[in-house]
Swiss-Prot record:
Subcellular compartments: Cytoplasm
Protein name: Uroporphyrinogen decarboxylase
Underlying gene: hemE
Lineage of origin: Bacteria, Bacillati, Cyanobacteriota, Cyanophyceae, Oscillatoriophycideae
Entry annotated with the keyword Cell division: no
GO cellular component: cytoplasm
Family designation: Belongs to the uroporphyrinogen decarboxylase family.
Keywords, in A-Z order: Cytoplasm, Decarboxylase, Lyase, Porphyrin biosynthesis
UniProt xrefs under PANTHER family: METHYLTETRAHYDROFOLATE:HOMOCYSTEINE METHYLTRANSFERASE RELATED, UROPORPHYRINOGEN DECARBOXYLASE
Pfam family, any one: URO-D
């Protein structure tokens, strides 16, 4: 039953099929906790090269697949990748994160942005996704991903990651029309990019609105939700059958609002009890998550307990097992292996 030759397991779950166990993958399952990744990073120190050189990105995406056989293989990339294609150059500095030398602060800058032409500015994405589909066949589901409008705007306006988001909040609360026009353009760009990823082979796409949890619920309703909805609406017009996931870090205060975005699956962070999340979202909404990444530093017996507890709280359908955030640097690889083995041995019948 778990080896349907036509449709991979995670995709079956994402389309609502009732299965013997939840599918499992991890956010940031390719990355710095893996020694094989660190060796490749030492050889190719530029993050943009690792994520935009198709051969390197394919190799990195497949490292956790070869090691652990997760039910989902997500392409190795970054949420900022499409920005250069609309006229916002950026770099990603190891240990510092993204840097945008000319942050978007004025109406004139917003007016100068151009529409995204992925074939022209992101041709490596096609190679990455097509190759991943060929490599994993129907043994795993290939996931694409994008940033959501508010989060991409936060990076582009701040010029880097931020703890306070004072620059973009200053724009939101003093020049909202400039920010709304920017968010609208970003929503168009992201929808184009999601469609492109699906056309290139992505079977499920996750949208990260990582910084929307920094908004009050009333500001979320104005600056985040309408633009998430626009992305989803545009994608569903052309690709109605591709499941879409929404993830927000620190989402406890806006969980019900996430459910109004139009996505098929809500990825829940670890600060919310999953049984409570299902109650708040309604049984019809599928969920993903939501184990604390710190659990993977614990004993294997504790990891097993937490996996079983999380699956039981989620109920026996409409759940994809994942962490509530990305895998942390320094996580023991053996514990990641144990996590996947334990999750895949689980049965709702037991």
């Amino acid at each position: 039953m778990t080896d349907s030759p036509e449709i991979p397991y995670l995709l079956r779950a994402a389309k609502g099929e009732i299965l013997p166990r939840p599918p499992v993958w991890m956010m940031r399952q390719a990355g710095r906790y893996m020694q094989i990744y660190r060796e490749l990073r030492d050889k190719y120190p530029s993050f943009r090269e690792r994520s935009e050189n198709a051969d390197l990105a394919i190799e990195i995406s497949l490292q956790p697949w070869r090691a652990f056989q997760p039910d989902g293989v997500i392409m190795f990339s970054d949420i900022l990748t499409p920005l250069a294609g609309i006229g916002i150059p950026f770099d990603i500095i190891e240990s510092k994160g993204p840097i945008i030398d000319s942050p978007i602060r004025t109406q004139a800058q917003v007016d100068q942005l151009n529409p995204l032409d992925p074939d022209q500015s992101l041709p490596f994405i096609k190679t990455i996704l097509k190759t991943l589909r060929q490599e994993v066949g129907n043994k795993s589901t290939v996931l694409g991903f994008v940033g959501a409008p508010w989060t991409l705007a936060a990076y582009a306006v701040e010029g880097k990651g931020s703890k306070s988001y004072s620059v973009i909040k200053g724009m939101a609360f003093s020049e909202p029309s400039v920010l709304h026009q920017f968010l609208d353009k970003l929503a168009d760009m992201i929808a184009t990019y999601v469609r492109y990823q699906i056309d290139c082979g992505a079977q499920v796409v996750q949208m990260f609105d990582s910084w929307a949890g920094q908004l009050t619920p009333q500001d979320y309703d104005v600056f985040a939700l309408p633009y998430q909805q626009k992305v989803v609406r545009l994608v569903k017009e052309t690709h109605p059958d591709t499941p879409l996931i929404l993830y927000i870090s620190g989402s406890a205060g806006v969980l019900e609002r996430m459910g109004k975005s139009g996505v098929d699956i809500i990825s829940v962070d670890w600060t919310v009890d999953l049984a409570e999340a299902r109650q708040r979202l309604g049984k019809a909404m599928m969920v993903q998550g939501n184990i604390d990444p710190g659990v993977l530093f614990g004993s294997q017996s504790f990891i097993r307990e937490r996996i079983i507890d999380t699956i039981r709280k989620a109920g026996n359908q409409g759940h994809i097992l994942n962490l509530g955030h990305g895998v942390l640097v320094g996580t023991p690889e053996d514990n990641v292996r144990f996590f996947f083995e334990t999750a895949k041995q689980f049965s709702y019948q037991d």
